[in-house]
């Protein structure tokens, strides 16, 4: 909605794997969602990705080839652990976030999304599970992308509050994500 409210044309394309229950963190289970927006009409799916958000190493590895040279890659660096890197086939002792060639080819923004989301949402006076808090990482990433592309976040917050608070009747989730 924030893209349309800004007067841009947009197109979306979900990408869900055929593997319904692939092991978490593996290449087989990577899902994605492409959002394309422009100040002119969009008639094609585009040639290359200008900016990518990778929430884990599997998402990074599966989609890196589509990002144009010099493109922006925002990663949840908290997920780039030895175990997660191994699950998606990286060699032992290799972390793509420390690769000089990749760092010179792309603008890689390493953000500790999991840690920052938890630190900002954990309150001792509320009974909220870590699992519910971790589900808010997507909204944290959306906030980064909105800032990066100079998009107003208020309409998104209103939609989140309406959807989770009114439609889904989960006011705590609405509050956590807004």
Regions found by a protein language model. Name each.
Residues 1-178:
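Active-site cofactor/cluster-binding pocket
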